[in-house]
């Protein structure tokens, strides 16, 4: 069962990305290093509710 999740930057709080994840195999919140346009560099993005 894939669900749509939003990724928010940990430094600015901006919600820059929307992706999908499989809740059965990844029940915990995902964390990815993605590009932040406001900071113009890669930062850690966490899944938000």
Curated annotation (Swiss-Prot):
Pfam families to which the protein is assigned, alphabetical: Ribosomal_L33 (PF00471)
Signal peptide annotation: none
GO terms of molecular function: structural constituent of ribosome
Recorded superkingdom: Bacteria
CC annotations in GO: cytoplasm; ribonucleoprotein complex; ribosome
UniProt keyword terms in alphabetical order: Ribonucleoprotein, Ribosomal protein
Keyword flag Lipoprotein: no
InterPro entries on file: Ribosomal_bL33, Ribosomal_bL33_CS, Ribosomal_bL33_sf, Ribosomal_zn-bd
GO annotation terms (biological process): translation
Keyword Ribonucleoprotein attached: yes
SUPFAM superfamilies reported for this sequence: Zn-binding ribosomal proteins
HAMAP family assigned: Ribosomal_bL33
Assigned protein family: Belongs to the bacterial ribosomal protein bL33 family.
Protein's name according to its UniProt entry: Large ribosomal subunit protein bL33B
Organism for this UniProt entry: Shouchella clausii (strain KSM-K16)
């Amino acid at each position: 069962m894939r669900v749509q999740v939003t990724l928010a930057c940990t430094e600015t709080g901006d919600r820059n990305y929307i992706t999908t994840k499989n809740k059965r195999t990844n029940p915990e919140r995902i964390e990815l290093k993605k590009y932040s346009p406001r900071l113009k560099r890669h930062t850690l993005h966490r899944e938000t509710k």
